[in-house]
From Swiss-Prot:
It is found in: Cell inner membrane. Belongs to the dicarboxylate/amino acid:cation symporter (DAACS) (TC 2.A.23) family. Its main location: membrane. The chain crosses the membrane at residues 8-28, 36-56, 70-90, 137-157, 180-200, 226-246, 285-305, 351-371. InterPro entries: C4_dicarb_transport, Na-dicarboxylate_symporter, Na-dicarboxylate_symporter_CS, Na:dicarbo_symporter_sf. Keywords: Cell inner membrane, Cell membrane, Membrane, Symport, Transmembrane, Transmembrane helix, Transport. It is a multi-pass membrane protein. Coiled coil: none annotated. This is C4-dicarboxylate transport protein. One of its GO terms (cellular component) is plasma membrane. It holds the Pfam family SDF.
Length: 417
C-alpha cells in the first residue's frame, strides 16, 4: 500500500496540472473518477452485509449489539451537534461573507435549482423510518442503500444467533464470503491513482482555480476550521480514549489521499472497515458504527452546513438574530441526518436546510455552486476521520478494542507479534 500512497499523491498533482493547463482534457477525465467510485460501490453493500451479519452471529449476544448501537448513536449526536455549533460560532466570529453585498435578485436561481429540487424531495420522519425497510431483500443491494443493507444484515445476524449450530455454519460462510469481497477490493484499490487523477483533473478543469480566488475567505475558513476540529476536538477525544490522532491519521493516509482525489468518503468505506478491524476493533462494532456513521456522523458536512449558511446570510446582507441562528441549528440537526458520504451530498443537505429556513433566499445557493466541489473534498476528509475515531471510541467503551494491538499498529509495527 505504500506504493499506492505515492502513486495517488502523484496522480492528484498530475490531475491538478492537467485540469489547470488543459481544462477541456481535465473535464473529459471525469469517467475515470466515476468508474473507480462505481467499482468500489459495487462491493460496499455485500461487504457490510457479510461483516455485520457474521459479526452479530459470532457475538451471540443481541443485547450487547443493541448496547453498541445506543452508544454509537449517543456519540454521533453529541459530536455532530458540536460540529454544527463550531461552524455557527466560526461563521459569527470570522464573518467570511461580510462585504460581498450581493443582491439576491441578481442571482441566477436556476443554477442551484437541481440541488433544491433534490432537497425538497426529502421525507418526514415516519417516511424516513419506513424507508429503512427495503421492499425486497435484493432491492436494498441493487439500490446500494447502506442503511437498508444494514437492517437486513442485523436481522440475518439475529436469525443466525437463534439457529444454534446451523447459524454458526452460516456465520462461517459469511466470514469466508467477506474475504472474497475484500480480495476484490484489494484489486480495485490498485486503480485508485487512475481514479484520483481523473476526478482531480475534472474538478480543476470544470471549476478552475478562479472560483477558489473569488471565495477564498470562505474556503480558507472552512479548511482551517475543519483542520482544527480534527486536531483539537477529535484529537482530544482520541487522547482521552488512549490513542494519538496524529498516528491515526498516518495509519489511514492512503485512504485520506484517495478521498482527497475523489471527494467521496464512501470510496474507501471497505478499506476503512478492514483497517479498523486490523487495528484491534471488534468486527461487529466496525460493521455497525462505520455504515451508520455515513448517515449520522458526518462532522465535515455539519461544519459546512452552518458555516456556509451564515456566509450566505452575510453575503446577501440578510440579518439573523440569535434566535434565528438557534432555529437554524435545530433544523440543521435534523437535515444533516439525511446526508451521506457521496460527492455533493453536503450541498444537497445545505439546500434542504435553506428550504426550511425562509430567512435566507434560496437563490443564494448559486454563489456556492462553483466552489462547492473544492469544499466537498474537505467535507469528505473530515467525515472519514470522524467516523474512524468514532469506531475506535465506541469499541473502547464496549470493551471491544484490543488496546495493545491498536498501539502496535499505530506505531507502524505488525498487528501481531
Amino acid at each position: 500500500m505504500k506504493s499506492i500512497y505515492v502513486q495517488v499523491l502523484i496522480a492528484i498533482v498530475l490531475g491538478v496540472l492537467v485540469g489547470a493547463i488543459w481544462p477541456q482534457i481535465g473535464v473529459a477525465l471525469k469517467p475515470l473518477g466515476d468508474g473507480f467510485i462505481k467499482l468500489i460501490k459495487l462491493v460496499i453493500a455485500p461487504v457490510i452485509f457479510c461483516t455485520v451479519a457474521g459479526g452479530i452471529a459470532r457475538m451471540g449476544d443481541m443485547k450487547a449489539f443493541g448496547r453498541v448501537g445506543v452508544k454509537a448513536l449517543i456519540y454521533f449526536e453529541v459530536v455532530s451537534t458540536l460540529a454544527l455549533v463550531i461552524g455557527l460560532v466560526v461563521g459569527r466570529l470570522i464573518q467570511p461573507g461580510a462585504g460581498f453585498n450581493i443582491d439576491p435578485a441578481t442571482l441566477d436561481a436556476s443554477i442551484a435549482a437541481g440541488y433544491v429540487e433534490k432537497a425538497q424531495h426529502g421525507e418526514g420522519m415516519v417516511a424516513y423510518l419506513l424507508h429503512l425497510i427495503p421492499d425486497t431483500f435484493i432491492g436494498a443491494f441493487a439500490d446500494g442503500n447502506l442503511l437498508q443493507v444494514l437492517v437486513i444484515a442485523i436481522l440475518t445476524g439475529f436469525a443466525c444467533v437463534r439457529m444454534g449450530d446451523f447459524g454458526e455454519k452460516v456465520a462461517h460462510v459469511l466470514d469466508e464470503t467477506s474475504k472474497l469481497f475484500f480480495g476484490i477490493i484489494h484489486i480495485v484499490v490498485r486503480l485508485a491513482p487512475i481514479g484520483a487523477f481523473g476526478a482531480m483533473g475534472f474538478t480543476i478543469g470544470k471549476y478552475g482555480v478562479e472560483a477558489l480566488v473569488q471565495l477564498g475567505a470562505l474556503v480558507a475558513t472552512f479548511y482551517v476550521t475543519s483542520l482544527l476540529f480534527v486536531l483539537v476536538v477529535l484529537g482530544g477525544i482520541a487522547w482521552v480514549s488512549g490513542f494519538s490522532i496524529f498516528r491515526f491519521l498516518a495509519y489511514i493516509r492512503e485512504e485520506l489521499l484517495i478521498v482527497l482525489g475523489t471527494s467521496s468518503s464512501e470510496s474507501v468505506l471497505p478499506q476503512m472497515m478492514e483497517k479498523l478491524e486490523n487495528a484491534g476493533a471488534r468486527r461487529s462494532v466496525v460493521g455497525l458504527v462505520i455504515p451508520t456513521g455515513y448517515s449520522f456522523n458526518l462532522d465535515g458536512t455539519n461544519i459546512y452546513m452552518t458555516l456556509a449558511t451564515l456566509f450566505l446570510a452575510q453575503a446577501t446582507n440578510t440579518p439573523l438574530s440569535l434566535g434565528q441562528e438557534l432555529a437554524l441549528l435545530g433544523v440543521a440537526m435534523l437535515t444533516s441526518k439525511g446526508a451521506s458520504g457521496v460527492t455533493g451530498a453536503g450541498f444537497i443537505t445545505l439546500a434542504a436546510t435553506l428550504a426550511v429556513v425562509p430567512d435566507i433566499p434560496i437563490a443564494a445557493l448559486a454563489i456556492l455552486v462553483g466552489v462547492d466541489r473544492f469544499m466537498s473534498e474537505c467535507r469528505a476528509l473530515t467525515n472519514l476521520v470522524g467516523n474512524g475515531v468514532a469506531t475506535l471510541v465506541v469499541a473502547r467503551w464496549e470493551g471491544a478494542l484490543d488496546r495493545q494491538r491498536l498501539d502496535r499498529v499505530l506505531r507502524g509495527a505488525p498487528a501481531t507479534e
